[in-house]
């Protein structure tokens, strides 16, 4: 009596499994499963994934419709933001101090020349300034009755007052406050003897008070502390 042995390694079970897979796949009677079809490059399975011309046309029409109705983002306007000007610090090193002097009013004149104030005139009469004083900065502020330019000029002697140099001069507007911080480089007074602040007004050069200054501030080397004479408290006949 023959007995059929059921087991995974028996040939009869393999034949039964192949038959079941063939029956499950009605499209191809040869391939066992999808992996077998890929290995064989079976045309019966490949036809399932083939895209027809109608499908391509429909996909192209759908893409064209989506593109036509898609919202295109509008470009955002670019607004330029001006950077604030760096503000100069008024703090000084420990070896420097500020001294100040009130500016005098300008009188009327009979000629249309430029206006100049020599640096030695600006610092004249300030008690803290001496022969050994070093000058580091000069601050000025003013309002003029006309547009024009101003700057610090070297070599101002006599009655001839040149225009402010192109490099280093600044412009100002009529009836608008303008200020400037001049760097003096720690020089002594005799080294700044021929230096002056020059104004070149476009019009109304002969009027009184054509330029009204807010005063002068000068950064100088710290003066030696004041001490009374040694014999100040010595009583004598």
From Swiss-Prot:
Cellular component GO terms, alphabetical: ribonucleoprotein complex; T=3 icosahedral viral capsid; viral nucleocapsid
- Keyword entries, A-Z: Capsid protein, Ribonucleoprotein, RNA-binding, T=3 icosahedral capsid protein, Viral nucleoprotein, Virion
Q: Where is the composition biased (Low complexity)?
A: 12-26
Is-annotated flag, keyword RNA-binding? Answer: yes
Q: Which Pfam families match?
A: Ilar_coat (PF01787)
Positions of the UniProt region annotated as Disordered: 1-26
What compartments host this protein? Virion
Q: Which InterPro entries match?
A: Coat_Ilarvirus, Coat_Ilarvirus_prd
* Molecular function terms from GO: RNA binding
Q: What is its main location?
A: virion
Q: Which domain of life is it from?
A: Viruses
Q: Which family does it belong to?
A: Belongs to the alphamovirus/ilarvirus capsid protein family.
Tell me the function of this protein. Answer: Capsid protein self-assembles to form an icosahedral capsid with a T=3 symmetry, about 29 nm in diameter, and consisting of 12 capsid protein pentamers and 20 capsid protein hexamers. Binds to the to the 3' end of the nonpolyadenylated viral RNA and is involved in viral RNA translation initiation. Probably binds RNA and plays a role in packaging.
Name assigned to this protein = Capsid protein
Native source organism of the sequence:
Tobacco streak virus (strain WC) (TSV)
